[in-house]
């Protein structure tokens, strides 16, 4: 009887020793571990590839503002829209090339008649008085052509989207704005140049005006008055004397 028990115990131990080891108990560096690592790496790489392909097929949704600006750049404008243009300002220019710099003392206009279809630009020389040396401006200002204005305030104080590029008869025109502003955006303690600070308070500030510009209204282009910087002026007030 005892011999039978010993035989069963030995057979049981031999069966346990011959049984395949589980993957959890496989030592590091064994073939089973290498196969498992390769399989997991392949699955991870495949998952990243699938995720990347999914992102390409389904790109992240753009913001409403970006979509509006994109549509403003790609919209095709009817040439008849320029025939309805009124209140033309020399500070607004549609051109296929950068306008002359302000130091050239030229004012550039956009031709609203048939010549616009030929992308012609007319520049006329203005007569400027000759300044003597030693003359200074009360406020220092800078004037530049702004080429990438996308946002502005209309005459009602509401924000509007300004068209940067205009597609007219398969030609892309850029909308430029000639703006003038104070060189120093913050008022200086000394005030305006040449103003007697003993009797007057003064500071330089940028003033604005409204010009007709091509803007986006929904999904179509329309003319609207927008506000741009046009001058740097001196604001003065009399100092109150204490008696």
UniProtKB/Swiss-Prot annotation:
SMART domains: NGF
SUPFAM superfamilies to which the protein is assigned, alphabetical: Cystine-knot cytokines
Annotated glycosylation sites: 148
Any one cellular-component term (Gene Ontology): axon
Disulfide bonds: 139-204, 182-232, 192-234
Pfam families in the cross-refs: NGF
Region span, Disordered: 47-69
Expressing tissues: Expressed by the venom gland.
Predominant location category: secreted
Locations listed in the record: Secreted
Secretion signal span: 1-18
GO molecular function: growth factor activity; lipid binding; metalloendopeptidase inhibitor activity; nerve growth factor receptor binding; toxin activity
Propeptide boundaries: 19-125
Top-level division of the source organism's lineage: Eukaryota
Bias (Basic and acidic residues) ranges: 47-66
GO biological process: cell surface receptor protein tyrosine kinase signaling pathway; modulation of chemical synaptic transmission; negative regulation of neuron apoptotic process; nerve development; nerve growth factor signaling pathway; neuron projection morphogenesis
UniProt KW keywords: Cleavage on pair of basic residues, Disulfide bond, Glycoprotein, Growth factor, Lipid-binding, Metalloenzyme inhibitor, Metalloprotease inhibitor, Protease inhibitor, Secreted, Signal, Toxin
Record note on quaternary structure: Homodimer; non-covalently linked.
Family: Belongs to the NGF-beta family.
Function, as annotated: Nerve growth factor is important for the development and maintenance of the sympathetic and sensory nervous systems. It stimulates division and differentiation of sympathetic and embryonic sensory neurons as well as basal forebrain cholinergic neurons in the brain. Its relevance in the snake venom is not clear. However, it has been shown to inhibit metalloproteinase-dependent proteolysis of platelet glycoprotein Ib alpha, suggesting a metalloproteinase inhibition to prevent metalloprotease autodigestion and/or protection against prey proteases.
The protein's name in its UniProt record: Venom nerve growth factor 1
